[in-house]
Structure formats: structure tokens, C-alpha cells
Amino acid sequence: MSVLTKQLIYDIYVRLLHLNEQKANTSLQQFFKEAAEEDVIDVPKNMTSIHVIDCIGQHEPINNTGIFRKMNLSKANVTKISTKLIKEGFINSYQLTDNKKEVYFKLTRKGRQIFDLHEKLHKKKELAFYQFLDSFSQDEQNAVLKFLEQLTSRLEAEQTDDT
């Protein structure tokens, strides 16, 4: 591969990172808009809280350690977010009868509304992404898959090195 091609790939990668940052802000506004259309009035104010609700909804019952492992957040951040979500009425905490040490979380009715809306929006985006992938041959999809797997592994390793 030529140096020019490598530079082009890197430039597009950096552009993708910037677009992803911008998209995060747009996604939250889109979520608020969809929530209003569905008459869901009370919505968490950031996407991380919405994603914690999603994680809890997918894995009930789940504790802080489970959330931190599945979402790659710090334990302190998970504790802060879960405390806020309890206070705001999106989740409840409880202990299992056979384990009084661990605190587990489950969604409230209000949290379930957020979970359901988030799932609906993700399904819509997932379908659009699959349709986009259909424009590539199987060999091209395999190359993209290999690239993304290796890039993700590298970024995860860098993140681990930074902590």
C-alpha cells in the first residue's frame, strides 16, 4: 500500500472520529425529539445515562460491576450515573435474598419507556446500516470486518494503557 493511500485512510479515519463526536450531540437531540413524539416527557439529559438504562434493560438483574464491564465505564462513573438514575426514577436498586452484599438494578416503568424508545431507534439505525453494507460485496464486507476488529482491539489496548 502506498504512503498516499495510507495518508488518505488516516485522514478519513480522523474525519470519522470528528463526525462521531458531532453525531453524539445530534443523537441526543434526535432522542429528545423522538421522545416528545412518543409523549415520553422525562428523559435523561445525556446519552451515557440512556445507554446505562439500555444496558440494565438488556441484562436485568445487573449490578455496577456488570454495567462497568459491559459498557467499559469506570466503576466510579457507573456509581454516579446509577445513583442519579435512581434519584430521577428511571431505575430501582435491590438486593437478592441470597446475597445482601451486592446491589442490583432494574428498570422502573419510566426507565422501561426510555429503554423501549432507545431500542426502537437503534433498530431503525441498524436496519439502515445493514442496507448500507449491502452495497458492498462479501469480500469487501469481510475486509471491513477485519479492519474494524483490529482497529477496535488496538483502541481498546491503547485505552487500557492510558489508565
Please give the residue ranges for each predicted region.
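N-terminal helix-turn-helix DNA-binding core of bacterial DNA-binding proteins
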Residues: 29-73
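Charged, amphipathic alpha-helical coiled-coil/dimerization segments
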Residues: 86-138
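Terminal interaction helix/tail motif
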Residues: 2-9, 120, 124-163
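Generic detection of well-ordered alpha-helical segments
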Residues: 14, 18, 50, 65, ...
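Canonical helix-turn-helix DNA-binding module
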Residues: 60-103
